[in-house]
Design a protein with these regions (language model features):
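N-terminal positioning helix adjacent to the helix-turn-helix/winged-helix DNA-binding module
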Residues: 5-13
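Helix-turn-helix
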Residues: 9, 17-51, 55
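Short, hydrophobic secondary-structure boundary micro-motifs
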Residues: 27, 99-101, 114, 135, ...
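Amphipathic alpha-helical interaction segments
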Residues: 30, 82, 86, 100, ...
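Short, basic, alpha-helical segments at the C-terminal edge of helix-turn-helix-like DNA-binding modules
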Residues: 57-64
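Hydrophobic alpha-helical connector segments
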Residues: 68-100, 107, 117
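Amphipathic alpha-helical packing segments from all-alpha helical-bundle domains
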Residues: 110-132, 137-152, 170
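C-terminal peripheral helix-coil segments that are non-catalytic and often amphipathic
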Residues: 128, 159-205
């Protein structure tokens, strides 16, 4: 069994509060009480509420990367499908809070704007998890494309309350199809589905 860390406890408390009170109801004092930590310790690490969401994103990235088996084989498309489904699996315990945040983002698009560059960074890490190698400039393009795939998948996931997530998987499959066609048209993929370049994706900033 995976050991629960203080950050895990904090993030679980974060999403419980958002699920109950919404983004507008999230305060550092309320979070400190829910997580059983001192408010001063939150101030030291999290200047703003956005920093809490960024922590959650990093933890999800780390969970996916930790579950990646080196040399996993298969096509790029299959590896990306696996990586993004594992990302959704890591998010599933926080589904109620995430869905509430999505609703709040419709009313306050500033949240989405603030998060958008960090989604691109996370997607470049997902390329790493899928063992997709590319030069930095191509990696940025592939990361942007994967962000589009991810957002389309998240929209389906938000509507999909089935246990097997069949609708979500179908949406991901379709989004990957579209992304693959676009990547081929831009010369970013070879005929075998691998990137046309073969240097590591390393740059993530």
């Amino acid at each position: 069994m995976t050991e629960t860390t203080p950050d895990d406890t904090l993030i679980a408390a974060l999403w419980r509060i958002i699920a109950t009170h919404g983004w507008s109801g999230l305060t550092m004092r309320r979070l400190a009480a829910e997580a059983g930590v001192e408010t001063a310790s939150l101030r030291e690490r999290f200047p703003t509420r956005l920093d809490l969401l960024l922590l959650h994103g990093r933890l999800i990235d780390q969970a996916v990367l930790a579950g990646t088996i080196p040399g996993q084989g298969g096509s790029v498309r299959d590896r990306l499908f696996d990586v993004l489904m594992r990302r959704l699996d890591a998010m599933q315990p926080y589904r109620e809070g995430l869905l509430q945040l999505f609703e709040d983002m419709r009313r306050d698009p500033v949240i989405a704007l603030a998060l958008s560059p960090h989604i691109g960074i996370s997607m470049r890490w997902m390329l790493e998890a899928a063992e997709v190698e590319a030069k930095s400039c191509e990696a940025r393009l592939l990361g942007l494309g994967l962000a589009g795939v991810w957002l389309a998948t998240i929209r389906a996931w938000a509507r999909d309350d089935s246990a097997d997530m069949a609708a979500t998987m179908a949406a991901l499959d379709n989004a990957l199809d579209r992304a693959e066609r676009i990547a081929r048209s831009l010369g970013l993929l070879r005929g075998d589905g691998e990137p046309t370049i073969s240097e590591p994706v390393a740059e993530t900033s």
